[in-house]
Amino acid sequence: MEPPGPVRGPLQDSSWYEPSAELVQTRMAVSLTAAETLALQGTQGQEKMMMMGPKEEEQSCEYETRLPGNHSTSQEIFRQRFRHLRYQETPGPREALSQLRVLCCEWLRPEKHTKEQILEFLVLEQFLTILPEELQSWVRGHHPKSGEEAVTVLEDLEKGLEPEPQVPGPAHGPAQEEPWEKKESLGAAQEALSIQLQPKETQPFPKSEQVYLHFLSVVTEDGPEPKDKGSLPQPPITEVESQVFSEKLATDTSTFEATSEGTLELQQRNPKAERLRWSPAQEESFRQMVVIHKEIPTGKKDHECSECGKTFIYNSHLVVHQRVHSGEKPYKCSDCGKTFKQSSNLGQHQRIHTGEKPFECNECGKAFRWGAHLVQHQRIHSGEKPYECNECGKAFSQSSYLSQHRRIHSGEKPFICKECGKAYGWCSELIRHRRVHARKEPSH
């Protein structure tokens, strides 16, 4: 019997691929985990995907939900949850297996992807896993969608390491040294970068020195030097290079020191550490990266509020918190003049003026202004009712419905008529009662 041919369309033949209330609940749990992760990483500039609305703009807890364009991020979150789920986190073996199925489906999306695409996801994941540690951050920073793209990134990196033909030029004496000229050729820095492609046990230099020299190769590689170096635009430092350098710098004890002449020295065990001259712009870029490195969290909350004693991992979070005490609201809406403590709250508020509704339901296409409203709406499709009454066990899809239901047990009547003082448990009852007074009023 011949084996079946490859499946070309999305996989749809298993019942546990279908969306369920369990899948929606897991999506919400993973979204909360994503928001906490982003907060720990100090990514203040990232857009907050899930907000509770303008009435809760002062709350510091914000949630994240998946949007079109953020699919790769959420897919990576589900992949990590699938790989790192622990048995102790689940009520029992059946629940553990069920949650793994849900996370696997949300990561690989068999209802959307073909068998070949799913195999490519798995091969790419394993390929990135077997890469040397020094290259994993580099390749992941390019967000490859397939194994071929990952290989292309590595091949491009290797091409950059190929030695260039030496062009003879006039010798320069010490008096002719330029402000940002290296005393040795660029080939030494590129050679240090090539060391990162070797296995760890064969690397002749400490990690920090490799990263430092690699960083120098990035900020100085500009091809042939022009005659007028004063007008040369400084090579920019890319986000990926910054990330790689910061990660390596955080794991090493070497010290980088800037002298008053703009010369950066690497104080390292190797006595042959290079001495390099940079332009002021390049030195400032390096200083900014060192500042970013100092913000890398150690897990300790070292930043304490002098007003209330609350502590934070990031100093930037402390600055935002202190506005609660000072009342400062530096972000102002240009349309209505309303002010806010955080820029993210201003961005949410501006949706009222623009009419933007970025949160769209995948089931019916209905759009919402706030992520919380989308979550509530999706419970209509999933049938999820997470809010349960402690008195009678009745469940509800929204917390407001549960609050209204509890008045039946408590006898609370918060809606009071201003005319006669009569109280009601429901707003609709008060509205009907007011019509009685309206009919009794004499007509003019």
From Swiss-Prot:
UniProt source species: Homo sapiens
UniProt-reported outcome of changing residue 150 to V: In a colorectal cancer sample; somatic mutation
Q: Would I find Lyase among this entry's keywords?
A: no
What are the alphabetically sorted keywords of the record? DNA-binding, Metal-binding, Nucleus, Repeat, Transcription, Transcription regulation, Zinc, Zinc-finger
Which family is this protein grouped under? Belongs to the krueppel C2H2-type zinc-finger protein family.
| UniProt-recorded name of the protein | Zinc finger protein 232
List the Gene Ontology MF annotations in alphabetical order.
Answer: DNA-binding transcription factor activity, RNA polymerase II-specific; RNA polymerase II cis-regulatory region sequence-specific DNA binding; zinc ion binding
List the subcellular locations. Answer: Nucleus
| InterPro entries assigned | SCAN_dom, SCAN_sf, Znf_C2H2_sf, Znf_C2H2_type
CDD domains xrefs: SCAN
Q: Where is this region: Disordered?
A: 161-188
What gene makes this protein? ZNF232
- SCAN box domain span: 79-161
Q: What is its main location?
A: nucleus
A cellular component annotation (GO) from this entry: intracellular membrane-bounded organelle
Zinc fingers classed as C2H2-type: ranges: 303-325, 331-353, 359-381, 387-409, 415-437
Q: In which tissues is it expressed?
A: Ubiquitous. Higher expression seen in the liver, testis and ovary.
Q: Name one GO biological process term.
A: regulation of transcription by RNA polymerase II
What role is this protein assigned? May be involved in transcriptional regulation.
